[in-house]
Amino acid sequence: MSVAIIGAGAFGTALAVSLATKGPVTLWGRDTEWADTGENPRLPGVPLPPALRVTDRLDEITAETVLLALPAQVLGGFLAEHGAQFDRRNLVSCAKGIDLATLTGPSALIAAACPQATVAVLTGPSFAADIARGLPTALTLACADAGAAEALQRQLSTATLRLYRTTDVTGAELGGALKNIIAIAAGAAIGAGYGDSARASVVTRGFAEMLRLATALGARPETLPGLSGLGDLVLTCTSEQSRNFRYGLALGSRRPFAAGTTVEGASTARAVTQLAERLGIEMPISNLVAGLAEGRIAMEHALDFLLNRPLKEE
């Protein structure tokens, strides 16, 4: 089966570079003037392989399997405009977030726009630069259809990109979305000078929040401790390669953050506060991140916000 990627950002390009080691790949982006230079400025230092073709024409995306590497808050609009032409294909979401307009994950957006498509999710602990440079990386491929999951696992795995499969789409998708919120909180703890012990507490209690909400929304409990949940959480809470962690650092140290940079965790936190209220679930770290991102809570009050909560069993 042929493969194409929608979204020529760093992650979409990295996946295209990796998959091009197995055969021809088409990468679509709105702005592709850089293609003639042989390198995407969003992924500097990584040459585009000969098997990778870059285009800005959606009618040239004819592959049977299409990876949607678009930000979570952009995906819905793209599907509303173009989804019909991608129905009846294998559509793999690479977004990590919750759509603010519908309070649903990317897979639900795809299923609604393309009801005849086979919908899957690709998620897990990874940085674009690592994938593009051929460094060993393991991800989760989730699809409700076990047979399709196995076929996509074989198709999208490469010599350095190892995919594990699951049929728990909800769990895999929520793990990738929710960990971004906790990464912001972990970054804020470090940026504010609270130290590594505080970060460890944020990560651990944050994972408990992830598990509470995900299982309430139908995820299997055993999915979250895997690559798509705990694995991604550990990576993004400990590395400045993570935009969400860097955003938290900026919040904690009261420094400006690069304008125009996509920070999925900030939008996801806003969505999660609404979901948690609807379900009656306590999500204090997520509420804090939403408050910090929206300016409702000042960083100097963040510690009190968490530590002054009632004492309880772990």
UniProtKB/Swiss-Prot annotation:
One GO CC term, this protein: cytosol
A molecular function (GO) term: NAD binding
PROSITE patterns: NAD_G3PDH
Record has Aminoacyl-tRNA synthetase as a keyword: no
GO BP terms, alphabetized: carbohydrate metabolic process; glycerol-3-phosphate biosynthetic process; glycerol-3-phosphate catabolic process; glycerophospholipid metabolic process; phospholipid biosynthetic process
E.C. no: 1.1.1.94
Compartments, record wording: Cytoplasm
Lipid biosynthesis in keyword set: yes
UniProt keyword annotations, A-Z: Cytoplasm, Lipid biosynthesis, Lipid metabolism, NAD, NADP, Nucleotide-binding, Oxidoreductase, Phospholipid biosynthesis, Phospholipid metabolism
Pathway of action: Membrane lipid metabolism; glycerophospholipid metabolism
Family per record: Belongs to the NAD-dependent glycerol-3-phosphate dehydrogenase family.
Function summary: Catalyzes the reduction of the glycolytic intermediate dihydroxyacetone phosphate (DHAP) to sn-glycerol 3-phosphate (G3P), the key precursor for phospholipid synthesis.
Record's protein name: Glycerol-3-phosphate dehydrogenase [NAD(P)+]
Taxonomic lineage: Bacteria, Pseudomonadati, Pseudomonadota, Alphaproteobacteria, Rhodobacterales
The gene coding this protein: gpsA
